[in-house]
Regions:
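N-terminal basic, low-complexity leaders that serve as flexible interaction/assembly modules and, when applicable
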Residues: 1-44
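Alpha/beta enzyme core
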Residues: 3, 33, 38-40, 45-205
Length: 207
């Protein structure tokens, strides 16, 4: 194991050997293996933005297996997707790419300035599919943010109790945040800090 990966694992000394082992699997897979850097292919666009909008420009992408193979061929560290997408190919591609089960999702079928994602999967699902981690999206700035923070924390506790790693995607969104503010450095940094606090760990921001 590389010195850099050992250093990163040392940041998670409060976690179990199982969780640290799964984190090591993420860091030691793909073209960036051992460098301490991560490239994860996330494919939640079909749920979040609609299949036609997301996949029509590249019809092959309608096939869930396409994304597994894309992550593998691209040398990604992991592939992250909602429950249905992972269920479609987890057996066929078992052991070829670390999987991250996206636990909550949001749609755009109605205008919602203060987003609240629905919980669409469970830790049991992640274990059944052989995932190394679960992922959860939070929207700091939304009027529903407090609900998401609680859900996120409960999900992380349960996942880590079973030796899984956890990923938090933290996006500043809400009726009181301007479009420019969504990408403002101070606002994004604040959202990242909230995500870190949710995980109880150091921010992993080596890019």
């Amino acid at each position: 194991m590389s010195k850099r990966v050992k250093e990163i694992l040392s940041w998670y000394s409060s976690d179990s050997p199982g969780t640290r082992t799964n984190l090591a699997r993420l860091l030691n897979h793909g073209r960036l293996a051992g460098t301490g850097r991560l490239v994860i292919l996330p494919v939640d666009q079909g749920f979040e933005h609609g299949a036609a909008r997301s996949f029509a420009p590249n019809p092959d992408a309608y096939d869930p297996d396409y994304h597994f193979q894309l992550a593998i061929d691209s040398g990604c560290n992991a592939y992250a997707a909602p429950l249905g997408f992972l269920e479609a190919g987890a057996a066929e591609f078992a052991g070829e790419i670390p999987l991250i089960l996206k636990m909550n999702n949001h749609d755009v079928l109605h205008d919602e300035k203060d987003p609240l994602s629905a919980v669409t999967a469970s830790v049991k699902d992640a274990l059944r599919l052989g995932a190394v981690a679960v992922g959860f999206t939070i929207y700091p700035g939304s009027t529903a943010a407090q609900v998401m923070y609680q859900q996120c924390r409960e999900m992380i506790l349960e996942a880590k109790s079973h030796g899984l790693a956890a990923v938090v995607w933290s996006y500043p969104r809400g009726s009181d945040i301007s479009k420019a503010g969504e990408t403002g450095l101070d606002v994004v940094a604040y959202a990242a800090q909230i995500g870190r606090a949710s995980c109880r760990e150091r921010v992993y921001d080596d890019v």
